[in-house]
Amino acid sequence: MGFRLKVEGQETIELGLDNIQTVIYDTDTPDDSNARSTDVGSTLRISGKIITAVDGDSADDTLKLALWSLVPAEKADSYRKVTLEVIAADQVVRKVHFPNAFVVDYNEHFGDTEGVGAFTLYIKQKKDKTELATIDGGYPV
């Protein structure tokens, strides 16, 4: 199974099968509700490897993710269009699309023995635009 992430804004950020290791999609509603809540949110938590550029290869786009996480809320570019594809056996199992996503948390981890770093990106769809988020899948790549 593999993953492809595309973030579109003033610049395009793309991470692929080599970078992304785990993805968690979550529909978030209040836990203390006794009926279906209108307070619904959608989130993605994406984790993977930071790949170092070697032998003239270009660096991966994790640096661009880190820079996106620093964009202040006052700027329109803090919200971007995000598409995540989950791929298995040449099938798109899931395609999650957030047209107005923003970064909640971004972390990078480095150690002196691992050889590469790791990242975790936690994004949400803007709550007043949750109905614009889409999930589909079950078709060839």
Please tell me what each predicted stretch does.
Residues 1-141:
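Glycine-rich, low-complexity intrinsically disordered segments
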